Amino acid sequence: MQIIVKNISYIYNRKTALALKALDDSSCIINQGEHVAIIGSTGSGKTTFIEHLNALLIPETGTINWIFENEHKKTKEKYLEDVVLKRTYFKKVKKAKDIRRRIGVVFQFAEYQIFEETIEKDIMFGPRSYGVSKEEAKQRAAKYLEMVGLPLEFLEKNPFGLSGGQKRRVALAGILAIEPDFLVLDEPTAGLDPQGVKDILDIFDNINKNGKTVIMVTHDLDNVLERTKRTLVFDKGKLIRDAGTYEILKDEKFLVENKLKSPKLITFVNKLEQRGIFLKPVTSIDKLAIELNIYLRNKQQSNE
């Protein structure tokens, strides 16, 4: 699957004194299998952007092309959903249900997406809404509950008695059970303890390794550095930079100019470089330790 975003803009409270341009002429292409971060200061347009990816919002101007295989056709022909986004005649997006099945969104307060009386029913709701049989939906509920790190005995529990972190996992399992091609996450680690953060990010890594696209909106640039390969940076509604994650996060001047705090690891690496110690690109503490050991070993050998 592929999403092609071309010059989209969006205005909240259009034609009122409170009108706010939340997106301004933004374009990008997101491909199947990518692991992408979306960063920017508060109010930069990140959440508004992701709400366009599965047609929850329709831009004032611009187009979004969703390209995916149409399994209802007998041939291998691909189905191209090309929406010319003009509010004057688009009351709703054609094929919106198809789009939303393929692009699952987990919002910041995912626990508010829970509403059924048991966890099993809650996870089953999405697949059943898209025509999956009851038996298959039950199998998916068990499969994805375990995938998010919760035991099968939770299936019969009432989700409202769970902790905040557990509710978030249940909400994630419900989206995964739809089996989307793209998984879009808005601040997925907010409010979690360090172990919970690691666990949930490991889940996203495994999903990505299985060929799914993972798009993560977050303020935690340390996690962005370690987990993602590509980063989109928003400021005042504009997509101002789209490049490799390491390239962007290594540019401390750029981050400061855009009110973003450099990852602690990058700050340390930059200080090493100021002292004449240059290492290969590192994205985690473990990789930093390896590169430092190599540097010290080489330095020792050169002094012998």
From Swiss-Prot:
GO CC, sorted alphabetically, is: ATP-binding cassette (ABC) transporter complex
What residues bind ATP, as annotated? Answer: 40-47
Membrane topology term reads: Peripheral membrane protein
Q: Which GO terms describe its molecular function?
A: ATP binding; ATP hydrolysis activity; ATPase-coupled transmembrane transporter activity
Q: Which family is it part of?
A: Belongs to the ABC transporter superfamily. Energy-coupling factor EcfA family.
Write one Pfam family the protein is assigned to.
ABC_tran
EC number(s) per entry: 7.-.-.-
The entry describes its oligomerization and partners as:
Forms a stable energy-coupling factor (ECF) transporter complex composed of 2 membrane-embedded substrate-binding proteins (S component), 2 ATP-binding proteins (A component) and 2 transmembrane proteins (T component).
| Record InterPro entries | AAA+_ATPase, ABC_transporter-like_ATP-bd, ABC_transporter-like_CS, ABC_transpr_CbiO/EcfA_su, ECF_ABC_transporter_ATP-bd, EcfA2, P-loop_NTPase
Task: Give a short account of what the protein does.
Answer: ATP-binding (A) component of a common energy-coupling factor (ECF) ABC-transporter complex. Unlike classic ABC transporters this ECF transporter provides the energy necessary to transport a number of different substrates.
Which UniProt keywords are present, listed alphabetically? Answer: ATP-binding, Cell membrane, Membrane, Nucleotide-binding, Translocase, Transport
- All copies of domain ABC transporter, residue ranges: 3-261
Tell me the superkingdom of the source: Bacteria
What subcellular locations does the record give? Cell membrane
Source organism (scientific name): Mycoplasmopsis pulmonis (strain UAB CTIP) (Mycoplasma pulmonis)
According to UniProt, the name of this protein is Energy-coupling factor transporter ATP-binding protein EcfA2
